[in-house]
Every structure is written in C-alpha cells, then in structure tokens.
Amino acid sequence: MKPKSQKSIKFIEELHKHIVRSPLLRKNVQNKNESQIQTELRPIIFDYMVKHFQNQSWKNPESGAKKYFYWEGQEGRHTKIKTESFASRNYPDFIITNPYMIAIEYKKSGSGSIVKQGLGQSLMHTLGGEFDFVYCLIQDESQNKKIVKSIKNEKENIIIQ
C-alpha cells in the first residue's frame, strides 16, 4: 500500500464525485441486486477514466481507459492470481491499474452488516499488498439514512480514512 499523496487523494476524490454526481447512478437501488448496479457503474467509472486520460493529454484516452480499467468477471483481463486469505481469494468489483492500483468495492445496504462485509473485503485488498488504495462505494438503503449519518462518528471515520 502506498502512502497517500495529494495527487492520489485528488484522484480518488474526483472519482468519487464523478460517480455520485453522475445522472447514470441509480439513486433507488432496492429493486436491483448488486450485480445489476455494478453493470450500471461500469460506464460511469469508464467515463471518469477517459476524462482522466484526456486531462493527462493522452493521444487516445479511450484506449487508456480500456487498458487500465477492469471489472469482476471480465474475461481475459487482469487475471493475476490474488493473494489468498482465510482459504479463499478476494476479487474486487472493479480495478484501476493506472495511475494507481485501486480496488473498487460496491455495496448497497439497509443495515450495517453488508457495509462491514464491504469494509472487510476492502481490508483484505489492502493487506494483500496488490493494491495501493481501495475505494468502497456504499449506497445507504436504510429509511433514515443511518449508515450515511454514522460516518460522522469517530470510530467509523477512523475506519474509512
């Protein structure tokens, strides 16, 4: 895992803003399973990568995005053997390999239990040493948005930073 730099923080913050502000991001996810939402997230993240490479003055930013962005189940791409922990291997939902090795996890939850599962997976990605950073996107399905509100608590804030 790399230490955070201003450039890496900016990249991940801009990725987050791009995702959550996208009109393509479904706000009501209760009728969809995680796999369906992940399918909808792909073009949003891909678009961010294209824009990133455009800002870097790449000659062909779309080919850069195709080369450095992967998703779980994508055949023939990023097939490196993952580090095993607790007798299994953990694969992120999405992977960005340039400018940083970033594992991306997506979870939707009406309770904290699924959130904890996503954070546990994120921890495994981090401890496995393959990724520089992990971005975990959580959509709060609870009635009163208690998961989002809990992020302001000291313990939760320490965990997600």
Predicted regions and their residues:
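Interdomain/boundary linker segments immediately adjacent to catalytic/signaling cores
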Residues: 1-54
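Short glycine/proline-enriched coil/turn segments at helix->beta-strand junctions
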Residues: 21, 97-101, 128-132
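Active-site metal-binding core of divalent-cation-utilizing nuclease and nuclease-like domains
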Residues: 28-40, 46, 55-100, 112-114
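Conserved beta3 VAIK motif of the Hanks protein kinase fold
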Residues: 104
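Conserved protein-kinase N-lobe ATP-binding Lys motif
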Residues: 108
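Nucleic-acid nuclease catalytic cores
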Residues: 111-116, 126-161
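Charged helix-capping and loop-helix junction motifs
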Residues: 117-121
